[in-house]
């Protein structure tokens, strides 16, 4: 594949280490360290935390829910989980025809509709050698990541044959963009469940943009919408439901108690087909960050379908202003009805899927 830019992986990694040495350890997000960078970018391995015992994992989940989420958030999550488990989402046969040579161009083009700071962040990341793009044969647990170092994050994007990495690139660049606007608020003490808000909303808007500008086909548009729903809700909703229930218990239950709970849930929902090992794959904090941010993102999107600039502006303002005392009033002020908006989003997705199948 021909590209305008030649990605010198070793040079980028050296530059990362050089930049890393300029900052105090406290300025770097705890979960990103030198060994992570080696695993991610040199050995090209991504492993989850399955080596942790399930009790430690569940204790971490419980601590997060007790200390880092508000009662308002807990109630929102509980209501949304119930609805999402009942709401049937239809999926079309996936079509991946996106021309990856257009990835940078289409990303620049979309970001220019957001504002010049977002567009400049992508340009600077390329110029400063902070962007690392590589091909990947198999889909693992992530398609991209942002290594947040002060205001100059590093980005790693994986290109797959079964995905649109332009959406991934936009998602990660918007993390760097929002870090600049909020002084890395969500890596400090901000409400952590909002950390993915602008990034996920940008994915939805960019998918619309690519389709309206005939950069992707109708089938690709539906595939992207399906993938967004899968990644943030439907693929993980059962494990989120279980972990959420476990986090509310006074003590971490024994394995046999959890097995029994899984079996009870499976009677009503056959998608409860995971083993206890799945409980340690990803912490509840990470799963809820995507779920909760997506809930709010869809609420903003449904209110500003034809005005991506206003929608993203609203999301940015919420991320700037939100704290545990203001979030209820903020969502009310912007007229965000989470469950109603998600229901509309899914209904529209289902209609498009039926249209693609020729059923309507």
What does each model-identified segment do?
Residues 22-29:
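Charged, low-complexity interaction regions
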Residues 211-282:
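Long, amphipathic alpha-helical stalk/connector segments used for oligomerization, subunit docking
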């Amino acid at each position: 594949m021909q590209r305008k830019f030649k990605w010198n992986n070793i040079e980028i990694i050296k530059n990362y280490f050089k930049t890393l040495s300029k900052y105090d350890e406290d300025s770097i997000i705890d979960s990103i360290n030198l060994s992570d960078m080696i695993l991610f970018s040199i050995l090209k391995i991504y492993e989850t935390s399955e080596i942790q015992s399930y009790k430690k994992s569940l204790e971490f989940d419980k601590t997060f829910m007790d200390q880092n989420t508000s009662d308002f958030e807990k109630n929102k999550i509980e209501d949304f989980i119930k609805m999402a488990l009942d709401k049937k989402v239809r999926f079309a046969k996936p079509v991946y025809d996106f021309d990856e040579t257009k990835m940078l161009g289409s990303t620049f083009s979309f970001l220019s509709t957001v504002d010049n700071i977002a567009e400049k962040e992508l340009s600077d990341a390329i110029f400063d050698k902070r962007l690392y793009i590589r091909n990947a044969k198999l889909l693992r647990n992530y398609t991209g990541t942002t290594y947040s170092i002060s205001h100059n994050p590093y980005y790693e994007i994986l290109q797959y044959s079964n995905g649109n990495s332009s959406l991934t690139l936009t998602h990660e660049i918007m993390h760097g963009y929002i870090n600049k606007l909020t002084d890395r608020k969500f890596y400090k003490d901000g409400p952590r469940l909002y950390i993915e808000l602008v990034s996920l909303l940008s994915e939805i808007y960019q998918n619309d943009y690519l389709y309206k500008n005939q950069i992707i086909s109708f089938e690709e548009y539906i595939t992207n919408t399906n993938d967004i729903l899968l990644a943030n809700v439907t693929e993980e909703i059962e494990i989120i439901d279980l972990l959420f229930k476990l986090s509310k218990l006074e003590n971490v239950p024994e394995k046999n108690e959890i097995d029994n709970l899984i079996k009870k849930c499976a009677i009503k929902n056959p998608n409860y087909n995971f083993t206890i090992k799945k409980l340690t794959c990803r912490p509840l904090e990470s799963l809820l960050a995507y779920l909760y941010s997506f809930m709010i993102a869809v609420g903003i999107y449904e209110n500003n379908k034809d005005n991506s600039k206003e929608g993203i502006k609203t999301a940015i303002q919420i991320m700037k202003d939100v704290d545990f005392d203001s979030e209820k009033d903020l969502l009310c002020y912007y007229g965000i009805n989470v469950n109603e908006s998600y229901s509309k989003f899914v209904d529209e997705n289902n209609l498009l899927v039926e249209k693609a199948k020729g059923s309507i």
